[in-house]
Amino acid sequence: MQGLMQDVPLTINHLFDRVERYHGHKEIITATAGGLERTTYAEFARRTRQLAGVLDTLGISADGRVATFAWNTARHLELYFAAPCTGRVLHTLNIRLFPEQLTYIVNHADDEVIFVDRSILALLAPLLHTFTNLKHLVLMDDGKGDIPDDLGGHALLDYEELIAAEEPIDFPEITDERRAASMCYTSGTTGNPKGVVYTHRSTFMHTAGAMMVDSLGVREADVILPVVPMFHANAWGLAHAAVATGATLVMPGADLSGPALANLIVDENVTVAAGVPTIWMAVLPELKGRDTSSLRSIPCGGSAVPRSLSEAYREQTGLPILQAWGMTETSPIASVCQLDVDQQELSIDEQADLRTQVGRISFGVEARVVEPGSTNPVSWDGEASGELQCRGNWIASDYYDDPRSRESFTDDGWLKTGDVATVDARGRIRLVDRTKDLIKSGGEWISSVELENEIMSHPKVAEAAVVGIVHPKWGEAALACVVRTDDSLTEEAVIAHLEGKIAKWQMPKGIVWIDEVPKTSVGKFSKKTLRDDHADLFMNQ
């Protein structure tokens, strides 16, 4: 027997229609070099429809790729909807990729137009002559930045002039919910980045997921500050969820410094502020003594959240960090560490320990932790570890035009995340490490993440990254690369701090002091850089 329910395509157009119809009075605030710019969703909707006309006038193909090289701004939000709502594909370019990687992804995706912020045009200009399919270059003036003389032969069109020349148009009907809506390439830490193509359906479902109370719980009453870039994994879905619900949006623009973000949180009464751990390390001291009572959630992902950082926020603001997990291939939210109701009655220390997990897998997503090289599940005892795999309504099924897809997906359709994890009796997941970052020393496995968390709990440590490098006795050994807040901190003091917290064989065999932990294009620790920099350290001792 078949059901008798309507089957309406799940499209991004529905999100746009709701904010246009119901929430036109709500605000979008953008921080610029010249101060705050305020607009409404009504104005956003009108301009987005004008921008749709711009794409037609420029002759962008019916399913053409519309690239952005931009910060989090109201203009970028207009592009987030104008492209997919007209059937085209938004391609957000990660501004922190290496030049050769940018050339690769622009050409691989066949981008026809790039919309670029003036403040970062100089980063893109030297590469313009390498883009083989690019037809148009459009400047979005965010208040500062020189305009290079050499633009690879491309005329520089002005965003505002293009908008002003168009009347708002109706969007075409999107009848196929599986039509491509946007694409984002992975950070490419090994080899060329891989393209993930999101559909209207997957984006709709992920947006609904972000609105669930056991996820991020985005709602109309929220004031959302997405510090996580719109050029990376859909800004964790916050831009779409804000539009769907009519939540106020606070866009940080180019200035992601601790003081600037703290001012936005306090001055705009932000309720949800989302970013990677390094962002929250910089913001914390800037919030000291200030009114942060508006905050209800601080989602954090991209890398493991140190227990000490989450607890520092709880002690200072009354609100611990909300750890979430995902990746470009998962749209990206796949789990959120909300505590169960009975766990909220546990001691402060016990709750803090639980918050170092990434939580239970999100509704709409399935997960399994399997033994290496098999589909055999590990025990749900919180101890046995294996590879975390997932599948679901907003999980990638393949990479765009890439033969490497077979390496990342199982024969039965699950995504191999590359994360090593444990799962407890309640299905709560703890990430042990990335597969490539586990350290095998003297035949025993060492989790670099666990070591980092313990080292970063020392009050004189700002950041710490642990890598495995070749050792003459142990084959491989842990090296801790540490950023101190106080130069009086010694190697002996760090080792003493670790005693009793980890086993002796897990101790780092060396500590090096560094000024800053190198980061990848998405703000994660670049352990490959550290391994390369210190590859022979133990062999030369």
Model-derived features: positions:
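Conserved AMP-binding/adenylation subdomain of ANL enzymes
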Residues: 204-223, 233-271, 286
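Conserved AMP-binding/adenylate-forming core of the ANL superfamily
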Residues: 28-73, 77-81, 98-103, 155-161
